[in-house]
Amino acid sequence: MSVKGWRYGMQLPVQTLTRTLADPWEDKATVSDLVTITKKAEATGHDFVGVCDHIAIPDNDYAANMTTTWYDTVATLSYLAAHTTTVNLLSVVWIAAYRHPLQ
């Protein structure tokens, strides 16, 4: 989706399952819903779909509204790539320090 040189995309809902950031339906959403949303973004001409990366949850008041379900960025993008053809897939945030470089 481009308008005068601008490219438009979206960050996937569902992926974080964080109650403070999510719509009420998202906590019941499945991986299949991620695929459905990504395919819809592709079909409607979005240039990209992004996912974010957090595998460590802060120990604060904000965390009380978060779940521990955060899909792995690389695995999520790989899975979505197998179900799409033209939409660009990107990591909005990817924290390399969360992962051991040799594992």
Over which residues does each language-model region extend?
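N-terminal beta1-alpha1-beta2 module of alpha/beta enzyme domains
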Residues: 1-83
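Conserved catalytic cysteine-centered active-site region
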Residues: 84-92
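Short, small-residue-enriched loops and turns at beta-alpha junctions
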Residues: 96-99
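Catalytic cores of alpha/beta
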Residues: 101-103
